[in-house]
Amino acid sequence: MLTYPQIDPVALAIGPLKIHWYGLMYLIGIGGAWLLASRRMKRFDPTWTKERLSDLVFWVACGVILGGRLGYVLFYNLDEYIANPTLIFEVWKGGMSFHGGLLGVMLAVWWFGKRHGKSFFQLMDFIAPLVPIGLGAGRIGNFINSELWGKVSDVPWAMVFPNGGPLPRHPSQLYQFALEGVALFVILWLFTRKPRPTASVSGLFVLCYGIFRFVVEFVRVPDAQLGYLAWGWLTMGQVLCVPMVLAGIALMVWAYRRDAAQPKAA
């Protein structure tokens, strides 16, 4: 059994103002994505400037935060937030949905593309390899918050979490960091080293994330207010990942078939 590192969720307190690690992880993720995007920007479009890139990152970040929070409210805990709507604004306590954040990003990208003459999938293919940076940072934030831990386990790396009871559990946040953050980043980075058909990068991202999240959900404790939705093992996260996997496969097939059907330059 490993010892859980006792980390104060508050990174910095200035009088009554408290800066939480969870929020800092979002800033780190957004900042890291911007730095990587600035390196890849000219390859995406030589006419782009840092100002246009910053504009894109800003709207995508808004989509992540607003979509992620509203997605959690709608998918995971609607009754509680209807009873006490002010809880929606307490984001430092956690409660973000990746699937809601993805929908928020899609809306932001669609709107941005309309303004700047880029197709939806051109922008999504550019953004997709950047997303694992934010996902990985977010999972570290979950770990510091001692939330979203896994089931009771006797594996050598199990941990006793401060608010997870006296028994050691799977550190499922770290599993998700390794898969959604590190592995997904490497897969997409290697895949995009060569030119790919439009929408194929987006398809690979959606497919891999759906698979990784579906697998980790087997050892992660579901949200208490929802529990298991069917057969004693199917969680809300898994329900939301099934259409992602199907959509990812469909997108990749469509992208490559569309590319093959286009006439090639002599």
Swiss-Prot record:
It holds the Pfam family LGT. Its main location: membrane. GO terms for cellular component: plasma membrane. One of its GO terms (molecular function) is phosphatidylglycerol-prolipoprotein diacylglyceryl transferase activity. Its EC number is 2.5.1.145. Signal peptide: none annotated. Pathway: Protein modification; lipoprotein biosynthesis (diacylglyceryl transfer). This is Phosphatidylglycerol--prolipoprotein diacylglyceryl transferase. It comes from Pseudomonas aeruginosa (strain ATCC 15692 / DSM 22644 / CIP 104116 / JCM 14847 / LMG 12228 / 1C / PRS 101 / PAO1). The gene is lgt.
